[in-house]
């Protein structure tokens, strides 16, 4: 197995992307590993050590030092070390974030919102939100306005509730005159002087008209009851006959009422002439 050359200039170190301290650490690990490989007779893992040293120095570009890119053996070595595995995960996350900036911005907004919600609200008035102060003062202002408007509304109700007082008091002479007039009307009614119709309209005629009205109403009810008891085929003829009877009685009643009105009309000029 050919022995690897441990020496390197500062230019090569800068090309590899390694600082001076990391390069010395790499050389120590290289010598130790080479001695172990000589004893065990296995292959050289110089490329894996270069990648590990690059990750330890947090230089992302130093992973390109190994020619041909990292092979399966390098990945296995890196994943076997816990701190290297973490660095690889962070690098993969950065690549994903670069490819999808929208998801990264959404994640940032979620983190910012969570921080805002986590901030406790201070009880002091100096650090409190002015919007919350205005909302807290609104109900107080409403209460004050209601209290101011209540006495005004009460005064208006009191003014409306007091009715206008009218004086219904009259003299004793007026009351006595009204009493005499009512008594004279009552005496005229009892003596027969007070009549609804003229002198030509007798009480018998008025009673006749009243009897005819009652008879007509009673006949209407009786005919309607008989009509319901009849079958449907005979109801039409019965209703026609009942209608004729009612019309004849109504004509008789109308004529008697007209006679009363004519007698009253004749009585009016007689009274005016006398």
Curated annotation (Swiss-Prot):
Classification via InterPro entries: CCDC28
Annotated protein name in UniProt: Coiled-coil domain-containing protein 28A
PANTHER family (alphabetical): CHEMOKINE C-C MOTIF RECEPTOR 1, COILED-COIL DOMAIN-CONTAINING PROTEIN 28A
Keywords in alphabetical order: Chromosomal rearrangement, Coiled coil
Coiled-coil residue spans: 234-263
Marked site: Breakpoint for translocation to form NUP98-CCDC28A: 76-77
Biological source species: Homo sapiens (Human)
Start and end residues of each stretch annotated as Disordered: 121-166
Entry's disease: A chromosomal aberration involving CCDC28A has been identified in acute leukemias. Translocation t(6;11)(q24.1;p15.5) with NUP98. The chimeric transcript is an in-frame fusion of NUP98 exon 13 to CCDC28A exon 2. Ectopic expression of NUP98-CCDC28A in mouse promotes the proliferative capacity and self-renewal potential of hematopoietic progenitors and rapidly induced fatal myeloproliferative neoplasms and defects in the differentiation of the erythro-megakaryocytic lineage.
Biased composition, class Polar residues, residue ranges: 122-138
